[in-house]
Amino acid sequence: EGQFAVRLRIPSWVKDAPANNDLYTYINKVGNYTLKVNGSSVTPVEGDGYATIARTWKAGDVIELDLPMEVRRIQSHDEVEVNRGKLAIERGPIVYCLEGQDQADGKVFNKFIPADTQMDAAFDAELLNGVVVLTGTAKEVDLDGKVKDVPFKAIPYSTWNNRGRDHMV
């Protein structure tokens, strides 16, 4: 109990900046974090990546910090030539990828995901001891150049190649 400040780390991905520089930017903006003390919203002092709450604290006070974990698209600075026209997919701090064995045809290089594609996040308890996967509809290009809609599944990049060697994009 007493008068003191509590500082909570607010990750850059919550503040519409995937990194603390201009190398990467989010295409889609999302809502900010919310902070409550004992169920009531508070407006903290922000600075240096922290939200600071200064007050008189009592035993049993509860702080609730809600960090939005929405699916985002990231693009790199246009001067990174190899990344022009490409986007990364992120949910919270996790970067996602497509792995061949999760796609109906086992391929990944024949697919693209339009920037406005709706993606849904769901926990898959059976996959790699449990991970959140993203699903949606991608565009698939066949050898004749025809394009069709196909379902896709994206997994956390950190889990790629944990089920054997496979293609990834």
Describe the residue ranges of each PLM region.
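C-terminal beta-rich recognition modules with glycine/proline-rich loops and embedded aromatic residues
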Residues: 1, 15-37, 46, 50-58, ...
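Extended extracellular/luminal ectodomain segments enriched in beta-structured repeat modules
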Residues: 2-6
